UniProtKB/Swiss-Prot annotation:
Organism of derivation: Escherichia coli (strain K12)
Family membership: Belongs to the binding-protein-dependent transport system permease family. HisMQ subfamily.
GO CC terms of this entry: ATP-binding cassette (ABC) transporter complex, substrate-binding subunit-containing; membrane; plasma membrane
Bilayer disposition of the protein: Multi-pass membrane protein
CDD domains per the UniProt record, alphabetical: TM_PBP2
Primary location group: membrane
Gene behind the chain: yhdY
Domain ABC transmembrane type-1: 159-353
UniProt protein name: Inner membrane amino-acid ABC transporter permease protein YhdY
Claim: rRNA-binding is one of the keywords in the record: no
Job description of the protein: Probably part of the binding-protein-dependent transport system YdhWXYZ for an amino acid; probably responsible for the translocation of the substrate across the membrane.
Length: 367
């Protein structure tokens, strides 16, 4: 019996290294200009990153309670640790801050079921949540009844106030902006003209002017002895201002839909509101998810303008802490911390927007 010996060729070496070299050559050194730009970026990172790491981590001061404890040449993160409560809660009484934490916990727990795919009556649940949860938050934070000590809104501040203004602003501006977008495309001249006037007026006025008018000028036109809380006036101004931008974003989605969608709804004998609610708006809102999230991110960052009317959000609380004589010279650490918080929230919203785009396949336009 003859034995046949089969010789197997050696396995080819891994192509990972060669693929990496091809990618580097194609994307970083494909031309002289690209090579110079790559080398310049490498040099810039070499010059900036090591000193930054040295300042932020290696030579940073982490332990202590006063400015005198910051003896190293790096960042004084002791300042952030000692003023963290002010950055998060503003001037809210220290012994009452558990109320804010409880409101946040209730919000997180109650929002979680909205992401369940098997949640029955999802629409009713969201509608009930939108009505009940703000009342719970107001009761917990403001108090004044049911054995809770009253805490005036002038004591609210920090990241808490930033989140309140941003969330209430977009929650109020979204439905109002949708109505304005529908009104601007209405066949009724009066409705269309009024919608156009409202949108163009608020789009032509800076937000800082709106806040100033709501806080300083509005009380001059009110009856003597009548007063409205400063935070309420600011929230109303933010909602009116932001609704104009939401309206234009939604109008872009409405214009992107082909006429066939309207004709299909008419063939089913659907009325105007059923057509908009069941056929048009779901598709239009799906198309403008990036624009809506961009508007939300812009509003979140614009909350820092409330300092003009004496409200101290996150950024204003950091500024207030840096002028404290006990912590002079800590402005860099404070602004870096504030920038990091803003970046975390804005980046998270941006990533969630990308998730929604992929989930709803916003790249496809209905035919």
């Amino acid at each position: 019996m003859t034995k046949v010996l089969l010789s197997h060729p050696p396995r080819p070496a891994s192509h990972n290294s060669s693929r990496a070299m091809v990618w580097v050559r194609k994307n970083l050194f494909s031309s002289w200009s690209n090579s110079l730009l790559t080398i310049g970026c490498i040099w810039l990172m070499w010059e900036l990153i090591p000193p930054l790491l040295n300042w932020a981590f290696l030579q940073a001061n982490w332990v202590g309670s006063t400015r005198a404890d910051c003896t190293k040449a790096g960042a004084c993160w002791v300042f952030i640790h000692e003023r963290f409560g002010q950055f998060m809660y503003g001037l809210y009484p220290h012994d009452q801050r558990w109320r804010i934490n409880l409101a946040l916990l209730i919000g997180l727990v109650s929002i979680a079921p909205m992401f369940w795919k098997i949640l029955p009556h999802r629409g009713r649940y969201i509608a009930a949540w939108a009505v009940i949860y703000p009342l719970i938050v107001w009761w917990l934070m403001y108090g004044g009844f049911f054995a809770l000590e009253r805490v005036e809104t002038r004591q609210w501040g920090g990241l808490t106030l930033t989140l309140i203004i941003a969330s209430v602003g977009i929650a109020g501006a979204l439905p109002w902006g949708i109505l304005l977008a529908l009104g601007r495309r209405s066949h009724m001249p009066i409705v269309r003209i009024l919608s156009v006037i409202f949108i163009e007026f608020w789009r032509g006025v800076p937000l800082i002017t709106v806040l100033f008018m709501s806080s300083v000028m509005l009380p001059l036109f009110m009856a003597e002895g009548t007063s409205i809380d400063k935070l309420i006036r600011a929230l109303v101004g933010v909602i009116l201002f932001q609704s104009a931008y939401v309206a234009e974003v939604v109008r872009g989605g409405l214009q992107a839909l082909p006429k066939g969608q309207y004709e299909a709804a008419e063939s089913l004998a659907l009325g105007y509101w059923k057509t908009q609610g069941l056929v048009i708006l779901p598709q239009a809102l799906k198309l403008v998810i990036p624009g809506l999230v961009n508007t939300i991110i812009a509003l979140f960052k614009d909350t820092s303008l409330v300092i003009i009317i004496g409200l101290f959000d996150l950024f204003s609380s950091v500024q207030q802490a840096t002028v404290d004589p006990a912590w002079l010279g800590m402005s860099t650490e404070g602004y870096v911390f504030a920038a990091l918080i803003y970046w975390i929230f804005c980046f998270s919203m941006s990533r969630y927007s990308q998730y929604l785009e992929k989930r709803f396949n916003t790249g496809r336009t209905p035919h």
